[in-house]
UniProtKB/Swiss-Prot annotation:
Organism (species): Lactococcus lactis subsp. lactis (strain IL1403) (Streptococcus lactis)
Name of this protein: Imidazoleglycerol-phosphate dehydratase
Compartments, as annotated in UniProt: Cytoplasm
Origin organism lineage: Bacteria, Bacillati, Bacillota, Bacilli, Lactobacillales
Pfam families: IGPD
UniProt pathway: Amino-acid biosynthesis; L-histidine biosynthesis; L-histidine from 5-phospho-alpha-D-ribose 1-diphosphate: step 6/9
Length: 200
């Protein structure tokens, strides 16, 4: 079974090329021009064992906008690629849950590849710091776009933490580990849809 997908997303605001292999080895080739976002997506790739290539350009490079559009559109493209690569979802474990201690911060991701997109996001990032050109308040928007385009029910909870970088890093790492669990194949359920309804 090959679980690979590629998407090209071009709008008046962004240009994105993204490809993913869900059965990869954690190889990342990420270039969005937003250093902190590249760092987080590289961590997502490594901890999920996906292979991920992203080339992204946005209007923040040409007309002086903030990188809001590119951050959200990368998440949209990533979500769509994950959904497409999963295909009919036969045999997947469907659920994933992982807690990451990131120094003083503790973050949990719980997710369900349910086909019912939803985001619950509990974290205090209201200070809207800038990290490497990345607006921290965009973190919730990133995960919302990811969840709604991948068809995932996604719960992200910051239990506690002080360093914003650590909290966000914990979110990306815990999401990666939970995705790794959820997309993995349950050898006892190969060829079966993981739902009593027979459809996801």
């Amino acid at each position: 079974m090959t679980r690979i997908s590629h998407i090209t997303r071009n709008t008046k605001e962004t240009q994105i090329e993204l490809s993913i292999n869900l059965d990869g080895t954690g190889q990342a080739d990420i270039s969005t021009g937003i250093g902190f976002l590249d760092h987080m997506l590289t961590l997502l790739t490594f901890h999920s064992d996906f292979d991920l290539k992203i080339i992204g350009h946005g209007d923040h490079e040409t007309v002086g906008m903030d990188p809001h559009h590119l951050i959200e559109d990368v998440a949209i493209a990533l979500g769509k690629c994950i959904s497409e690569a999963l295909g009919n979802k036969l045999g997947i474990r469907r659920y994933g849950s992982f807690t990451i201690p990131m120094d003083e911060a503790l973050v949990t991701c719980d997710l369900d590849i349910s086909g019912r997109p939803y985001l619950v996001f509990h974290a205090d990032l209201s200070g809207n710091q800038k990290l490497g050109g990345y607006d921290t308040e965009m973190t919730e928007e990133f995960f919302r776009a990811l969840a709604f385009n991948a068809g995932i029910t996604l719960h992200l909870n910051e239990h506690y933490g002080q360093n914003t970088h650590h909290i966000i890093e914990g979110m990306f790492k815990s999401t990666a580990r939970a995705l790794k669990q959820a997309v993995s194949i349950d050898e006892s359920k190969v060829g079966e849809i993981p739902s009593s309804k027979g459809v996801l």
